[in-house]
Amino acid sequence: EQGRLITPTLIKYADRVDYFAGASTIQLDQARRYRFPDEEPAADAVSGASAPEVKLVHWDRKGEEKLAAALLYRHSNLSYDDVWERVIDLGPGSRQAIIDESTAGLGAHDAPTREFEVVDYTFEFTLDYGAYREFKRHRMMSYLPQPLTVAHGYKIPPVVVQAGLESEFEQTVRPAEDVYWKVREVSPLAAQYLVTHAHNRRVVTKFNLRESYHLFKMRTSEEAHFSIREPMLEAMRLAVGVQPQFFRNLKLRNYPDWWPHP
């Protein structure tokens, strides 16, 4: 109440919003009603040093046409429909030339123009919670995380593996998991506080081509933390695999062995 007296304009809209307060409950009810299980214990709760789980679930199959149209639209006096029809008639060779010319001058710290935001990628990541907290700092994207849980196992840091301390690491994590399941029977929300940063969290995220340049440059370098570097390398491999032509002029600090461009 004192806040309302001192800074009334800052907290003018701080009242409870019933729609947002009830949205999560409605979604949980829908999942259960249509028999989508909300949680099951993992059969093997140790993910160890395995490869990150990354899936490219959707990508823009008209991306080349959309990007070329966006690049030509800005300084044209034609409607978008007219630009689109002409871009289709240009053929793939001309469209690729337009894209290449638009990225040829990119420096190591430059971002592509806004036109590159018209192409989207949707990924599903299974990241350890520490990596997830780093990942969500990138704001030019949408992300939909599932609740924190121990059901997807945990990531053992490579340095722990190299030191031969896997057993000690597991012995440290297991009690937290045991208590998690007990607390969850009483309060699923409270149980989430028992999830360690090593435990995996599943998230679906969508980001555009422009953001992918920034994300891949920053998070695939050798200086990046391993827990986010590995999944970002895999995400980049998947994106480049379906649309290599978009990444021809992407400037990386460290190129992976599979990089398709000279």
What is each PLM-predicted segment?
Residues 1-262:
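A conserved ligand/cofactor-binding region detector
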